[in-house]
């Protein structure tokens, strides 16, 4: 198991797909798990739903070269995310986030990490995983 937090392409100079493809080529994993924030169409869903998909990760950009899928990476891709933003009703270039965003991120990260750990370590109990991860 390896973990990477790639950052944004503007900061790294690499697209997410380029970075993921390089890592998959070097590490040869059985699968890739991607975690990302999601955009919701409804405010009441912000921080209140979790989405898992085996179809891969499709970032908001329409450019298909940014997608992380079995076709683009050569291995199964599972995507997980929690909606943390939505388009503002006024102004096409504005997004809205909840006031409690830091708390939503912290609790959501713990939930997703626990889910991934449980899936990868089915012989361990939830209590054992909590003890191991602190």
Indicate residue ranges for each PLM-predicted region.
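C-terminal functional extensions of proteins
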Residues: 78-134
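Conserved active-site and cofactor/substrate-binding residues in soluble primary-metabolism enzymes
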Residues: 11, 15-19, 27, 100-111
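Glycine-rich phosphate-binding loop
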Residues: 18-67
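Ser/Thr/Gly-rich flexible loops in soluble cytosolic domains mediating phosphotransfer, phosphorylation
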Residues: 60-82
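Conserved beta-strand scaffold positions in the cores of enzyme catalytic domains, especially
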Residues: 3, 32-34, 77-79
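Short helix-loop-beta-strand segments that form the rim/entrance of peptidase-like active sites
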Residues: 1-7
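Non-transmembrane, aqueous-exposed alpha-helical and coiled segments at domain scale
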Residues: 3, 13, 21, 69-71
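Short, ordered loop/turn segments at secondary-structure junctions
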Residues: 8, 37-38, 83-85
């Amino acid at each position: 198991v390896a973990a990477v937090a790639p950052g944004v392409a503007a900061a790294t100079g690499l697209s997410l797909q380029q970075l993921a493809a390089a890592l998959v080529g070097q590490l040869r994993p059985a699968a890739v798990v991607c975690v990302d924030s999601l955009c919701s169409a409804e405010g009441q869903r912000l921080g209140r739903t979790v989405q898992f998909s085996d179809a891969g990760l499709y970032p908001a950009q329409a450019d298909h070269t940014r997608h992380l899928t079995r076709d683009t990476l050569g291995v199964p891709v599972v995507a997980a995310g929690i909606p943390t933003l939505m388009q503002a009703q006024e102004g096409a270039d504005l997004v809205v986030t909840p006031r409690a965003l830091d708390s939503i991120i912290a609790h959501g990260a713990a939930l997703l990490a626990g889910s991934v750990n449980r899936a990868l370590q089915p012989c361990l109990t939830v209590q054992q995983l909590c003890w191991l991860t602190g």
